[in-house]
Swiss-Prot record:
NCBIfam families the UniProt entry points to: ribB
Signal sequence, start to end: none
Name listed for the protein in its UniProt record: 3,4-dihydroxy-2-butanone 4-phosphate synthase
Family statement drawn from the similarity comment of this UniProt entry: Belongs to the DHBP synthase family.
Subunit note: Homodimer.
Site (Essential for catalytic activity): H136, E174
Organism: Shewanella pealeana (strain ATCC 700345 / ANG-SQ1)
Reactions listed under catalytic activity: D-ribulose 5-phosphate = (2S)-2-hydroxy-3-oxobutyl phosphate + formate + H(+)
Binding site residues for Mg(2+) 2: E38, H153
First-tier enzyme category under EC: lyase
Cofactor detail note: Binds 2 divalent metal cations per subunit. Magnesium or manganese.
Gene Ontology cellular component list: cytosol
Protein residues bound to Mg(2+) 1: E38
Length: 212
């Protein structure tokens, strides 16, 4: 990881604290993983505070595959089975079947419809019957141990929400460039400056949790 690009955002603990403050204010944060892993940056919002405008930004500036990071408990509450029985993806990303709210949506594709689906899935009294399957929102199951168990964006997202005192559910999407290629750290930092968002790494979250 090119730490010089991250230096303006402080040390690892300061970067996490800045992200937690932004999330509590309903803002987005950018989380990058290691250069020898996916080497990608994800734009992350709290599912609890997510707005239609923020979803529109995710769809417009990112890959379009908007994922909802959920705890194992919530996955079980919603009875969401894994997308495949034998997950042989490179990093073991734990996709479940995709979902759509049964009420309050049209085709399910618009920013507003996707937000409606996410709010239905994270409601305290959410039931399996509240959701149609498949749909246009892609749930991801976070490992119970968070980034200390798996150093992925899914776990980093849920860990950040817990550390911020929010519901343990977050929304992520990979930042892409106008030509469709993946944004790397220099472009992530530029994106952060344009949108006034903090930047941090998965390793920062690991370091922060190890101080708890």
């Amino acid at each position: 990881m090119n730490q010089s690009l991250l230096a303006p955002y402080g040390n690892p603990i300061e970067r996490v604290n800045a992200a937690l403050s932004a999330l509590r204010q309903g803002k987005g944060v950018l989380v990058v993983d290691d250069e020898d892993r996916e080497n990608e940056g994800d734009l992350i919002y709290s599912a609890e505070t997510l707005t239609n405008q923020q979803m529109a930004l995710l769809i417009r500036e990112c890959s379009g595959i908007v994922c909802l990071c959920l705890t194992d408990e919530r996955i079980k509450q919603l009875q969401l089975p894994p997308m495949v029985s034998d997950n042989n993806s490179q990093y073991g990303t734990a996709f479940t079947v995709s979902i759509e709210a049964k009420q309050g949506v049209t085709t399910g594709v618009s920013a507003a419809d996707r937000v409606t689906t996410i709010k239905a899935a994270i409601a305290d009294d959410a039931k399996p019957d509240d959701l149609a399957r498949p749909g246009h929102v892609y749930p991801l199951r976070a490992r119970p141990g968070g980034v200390l168990e798996r150093r992925g964006h899914t776990e980093g997202t849920v860990d950040l929400m817990k550390l911020a005192g929010l519901q343990p559910f977050g929304v992520l999407c990979e930042v892409t460039l106008p030509d469709g290629t993946m944004a790397r750290l220099p472009e992530i930092v530029e994106f952060a400056q344009q949108h006034d968002m903090p930047v941090l790494t998965i390793e920062d979250i690991v370091a922060y949790r190890n101080t708890q």
